């Protein structure tokens, strides 16, 4: 991470309209970690054709009737589960990213969710988005991404189809006016 760019932890990363990478076209990611070694985020607007109840059943945890979607969190380690949630709770592998947003990777949170005693707000994803040292900074300087402050309401309560527009609207940007052609002034 260059000294000119502060951490992007607890920020949204929004794909510019000209970014045509199928893994990220039209996405909004929540950045969970960002340091000199790289960055890690979860795509929060790409639901898969699997419900949480299906995933919990595959893990033999029960949870029948939980209609919540499971998301494609990104192209890295797509077999690994990540739960963004609020509040923190007492799970084995949790990291507080912001006062109202945590990430957990341990099975105990899924067990609690199956029993109906999990966190109040959750987003379950398979896989994550990862960038090596300096890679994300270079992509941002090449106008592939817009960053803006994260908001837990957008992660947990905004419909998927509205997340990008809502996040950009919070900082005064109209997504529909963004150019699909990149460049530098």
UniProtKB/Swiss-Prot annotation:
GO CC, sorted alphabetically, is:
cytosol
The UniProt entry, under Gene3D superfamilies, shows: VC0467-like
Cross-referenced InterPro entries:
AlgH-like
> What NCBIfam families is this protein classified in?
PRK00228.1-1
Q: Give the family from UniProt.
A: Belongs to the UPF0301 (AlgH) family.
Tell me the protein's name.
UPF0301 protein HCH_00550
